[in-house]
């Protein structure tokens, strides 16, 4: 039984790693389609709509799986042990596979100049370096990427470790954590729409500045939060700015790409790698500070520092065609 449990754990870990790698790779191509399917004046709206639809899908599937796990008798699964949980994983895979077919059939087709696998291995690293060389020559793109790196360290760490903070510092139970996750997803949908409208009105840079200020306030508030009601309010604020900062970061980056660039995938590959590196930095800083301080409240303040650094760098970015207020 112990060996079987160990084998199942190994399968779970390997499956998680494969899924993470698959998602990380797919999001590069997904993001890179934005300049191909929308004109610059529509980047904010289309990027926000993409995140909004993604959050709608995640909420629907999450609710379905929660019902399967919580009320297995409704689905004829009573007394089947862990089968409802395993079925939930299966539904996620089928959901991804099914909706991927829609994307494959509707998105613009690839060009004919495809590379061999050998060429991909040889040229991939060179393409990455080429993007960085171009970015260094474009001052505003380079500044935005530095800003994005630092505030992404905060954003991705909050997304990944919010439930840990809730269970550790707020002593929240599983059902309460589920409510927090649902709250984040629903309000992220709303936030993506609100901040797309705001960015259209005042400009992407000013919109991001507003969001980073709010993120900083939320992190400082996390240090002082007492009681579950206050935490729910803070989680609601996180949800709003989470959806907004994700969609508007992508739209802003698209606006800063070199004029007439065709290989957007390479640029968004760099963007995604930078985000993953920021996630590693943020998670390490959060865990290290939590270990030193004996709690997670001080660690939340460290995340506020990341947002402030990103905010300061962002103020030096100039975006062509932006409104004067930006």
Q: Where on the chain are the PLM-derived regions?
A:
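Structural signature of the two symmetry-related core transmembrane helices
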Residues: 1, 206-221
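Helix-loop junctions at membrane interfaces in 12-TM secondary transporters
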Residues: 1-15, 223-235
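Intracellular juxtamembrane helix-capping segments at the cytosolic ends
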Residues: 25-39, 244-259
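A membrane-interface helix-boundary motif in multi-pass transporters
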Residues: 67-94, 288-307
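Multi-pass alpha-helical transporter architecture, strongest
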Residues: 95-106, 245, 281, 301-326
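Juxtamembrane intracellular "pre-TM" segments in multi-pass secondary transporters
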Residues: 108-146
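Short amphipathic helix-loop junctions that connect adjacent transmembrane helices
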Residues: 157-180
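Helix-to-loop junctions at the C-terminal end of transmembrane segments
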Residues: 190-204, 290
């Amino acid at each position: 039984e112990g060996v079987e449990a160990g084998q199942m754990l190994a399968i779970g870990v390997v499956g998680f790693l494969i899924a993470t790698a698959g998602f990380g790779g797919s999001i590069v191509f997904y993001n890179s389609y934005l300049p191909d399917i929308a004109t610059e004046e529509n980047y904010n709206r289309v990027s926000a709509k993409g995140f909004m639809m993604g959050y709608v899908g995640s909420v629907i599937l999450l609710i379905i799986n929660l019902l399967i796990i919580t009320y297995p008798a409704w689905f004829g699964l009573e007394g089947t042990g862990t089968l409802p949980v395993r079925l939930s994983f299966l539904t996620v895979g089928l959901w991804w596979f099914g909706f991927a077919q829609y994307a494959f059939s509707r998105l613009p087709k690839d060009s004919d100049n495809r590379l061999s696998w050998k060429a991909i291995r040889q040229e991939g690293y060179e393409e990455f370096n080429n993007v960085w060389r171009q970015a260094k020559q474009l001052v505003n793109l380079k500044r935005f990427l530095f800003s994005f790196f630092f505030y992404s360290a905060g954003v991705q760490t909050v997304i990944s470790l919010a439930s840990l903070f809730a269970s550790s510092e707020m002593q929240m139970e599983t059902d309460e954590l589920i409510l927090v996750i649902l709250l984040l997803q629903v309000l992220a949908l709303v936030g993506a729409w609100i901040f797309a409208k705001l960015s259209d009105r005042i400009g992407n840079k000013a919109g991001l500045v507003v969001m980073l200020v709010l993120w900083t306030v939320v992190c400082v508030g996390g240090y002082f939060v007492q009681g579950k009601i206050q935490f729910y309010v803070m989680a609601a604020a996180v949800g709003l700015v989470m959806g907004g900062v994700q969609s508007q970061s992508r739209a802003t980056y698209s606006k800063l790409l070199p004029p007439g660039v065709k290989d957007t995938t390479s640029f968004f590959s760099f963007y995604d790698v930078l985000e993953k590196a920021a996630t590693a930095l943020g998670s390490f800083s959060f865990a290290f500070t939590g270990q030193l301080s004996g709690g997670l409240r001080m660690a939340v303040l460290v995340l506020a520092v990341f947002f402030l650094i990103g905010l300061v760098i962002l103020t030096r970015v100039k975006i062509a065609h932006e409104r004067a207020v930006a």
